[in-house]
Curated annotation (Swiss-Prot):
Homomultimerizes to form the nucleocapsid. Binds to viral genomic RNA. Residues 368-391 have a biased composition (Acidic residues). The gene is N. Belongs to the novirhabdovirus nucleocapsid protein family. InterPro entries: Rhabdo_ncap_2 (IPR004902). Disulfide bonds: none annotated. Keywords: Capsid protein, Helical capsid protein, Host cytoplasm, Phosphoprotein, Ribonucleoprotein, RNA-binding, Viral nucleoprotein, Virion. Its main location: virion. The keyword Phosphoprotein applies. This is Nucleoprotein. It is found in: Virion; Host cytoplasm. Encapsidates the genome, protecting it from nucleases. If expressed without protein P it binds non-specifically RNA and therefore can bind it's own mRNA. Interaction with protein P abolishes any non-specific RNA binding, and prevents phosphorylation. The soluble N-P complex encapsidates specifically the genomic RNA, with protein N protecting the genome like a pearl necklace. The encapsidated genomic RNA is termed the nucleocapsid (NC) and serves as template for viral transcription and replication. Protein N binds protein P in the NC through a different interaction, and can be phosphorylated. GO terms for molecular function: RNA binding. GO terms for cellular component: helical viral capsid; host cell cytoplasm; ribonucleoprotein complex; viral nucleocapsid.
Amino acid sequence: MTSALRETFTGLRDIKGGVLEDPETEYRPGTITLPLFFSKADFDLEMIKRAVSHVGGEGTRRALGLLCAFVIAETVPSGRGTVAELLEALGFLLESLETGAPLEVTFADPNNKLAETIVKENVLEVVTGLLFTCALLTKYDVDKMATYCQNKLERLATSQGIGELVNFNANRGVLARIGAVLRPGQKLTKAIYGIILINLSDPATAARAKALCAMRLSGTGMTMVGLFNQAAKNLGALPADLLEDLCMKSVVESARRIVRLMRIVAEAPGVAAKYGVMMSRMLGVGYFKAYGINENARITCILMNINDRYDDGTSGGLTGLKVSDPFRKLAREIARLLVLKYDGDGSTGEGASDLIRRAEMASRGPDMGEEEEEDEEDDDSSEPGDSDSFL
């Protein structure tokens, strides 16, 4: 690990301004067509409850399509135009899609407990909240989603007035079935994102949409940016110098993408338009390429260790970070040496390569054998970072 790791920490000092442009990746909503689902059948409460109960079962795709059609039909933005006008104003192209016949009664009802909480007075809020929750499976894997449901969903749902969502079935098999139909590029996925954007466009529902899903779906890497800025401030280091000490070659492409994306987001007027740009990244054909702006788990690990030296408890967030145990130990040493290097004096002290060499020597214990010498691939976290600090 050591020699290969030393080579990757070469920094970005030779990468000048224009090189960080990313001319190949497009983040424009005008390249995305969002479906507006509709149903020829009249909606009634029992039909909606049946669809909710089927979410997570064999009829998940049809159930979610029908629920999208219901929300689109029932949503009347407060003085902001029609649903279609709102999405067109954000720059998206639209198409109408029929959901097909209503679902039949079956025994496959994994979300029956949630369905039974639905009454006429809360049906729109509960169904919308369910779609928000399901949308997270476009970014969270099943384990992450199960953890989210266990640790966060009840608190967030209750705070947003949809406490019924505590009855959402977080069984891993159920979550896997939902995630299987919400893949990048699928029309159902785009339809749900459209509903999120509709809610973000309406001041009456924007806070709920942000709290329950949008801040976790934007994927801008702002969590890492916030950690970086705080570390630079704590160290008294120039951001460019700290970047040289931390950046790996593997994130140069990510840097290009995030610079371009953030410039476009900065130009977008209004909260919904900004989210529209960010979400268009996740809905276009270049999804997997554009998704490369995820935070780098190793750098985040180091930054958290730096900030923990100034604000005890910061490193508590390292529990779910996917890095090897040897690297965790190395990250602590790098953080310690960076504090010694800068010590509030800016860019004085030894260079990055010497710093990494010293950290490697200090972090190597007697139990670290030859197997840890091999090159380690970049372990990005499966959760790209909740972008709660963006807005």
